[in-house]
Amino acid sequence: IVTEFKKQGAYIVEDAEEKDKLREVCFPGGGAFSRFCVGNTAPEVAEQAGIADVPAGTRVLAAVVDGVGAADVLCREKLCPVMGILPYKTFEEGVANMVANLEYEGKGHSIGIHSADDAHIEYAAIQCSVSRVVVNQPSGTTGGGSPTNGFTPTTTLGCGSWGNNSFAGNLSYEQ
């Protein structure tokens, strides 16, 4: 998958020093996400972090994280084109990593899975405390509703009691 990420314009961040720079620019001092990264392009974030040689057309900075959940701030939500990559050996291990990240930040929100294996889809859905499971669709956009999935179109997604919200669905005029 990393090879495909590269083909699609990802810059893979593996160097420990570059990862530390990325952590610091996104989460200064290990705290809240930096508002200065919001909405920036991948090359702009890289420049802010002092990461050299990132091509101008780079679409995402993909950092190989050092752990799951609280073990690495790059597992947290980032409102910019930065993502974490965490290798795993089995499907179950991958789902366990996802659950650990959701427990740390994101409980009740959503997951996305791309699979033709119904057993894998069901397994992932059952393991996660989420309000919506997006299957074989771009979850970043269709979790908020789409004519192809039956979710109510919205820009406000409830996380239910897992996320300390009063509702678990997609907010609409009916709520």
What are these regions (language model features)?
Residues 1, 52-175:
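Conserved C-terminal structural/oligomerization subdomain of aldehyde/semialdehyde dehydrogenase
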Residues 1-69, 94:
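ALDH superfamily catalytic-core signature
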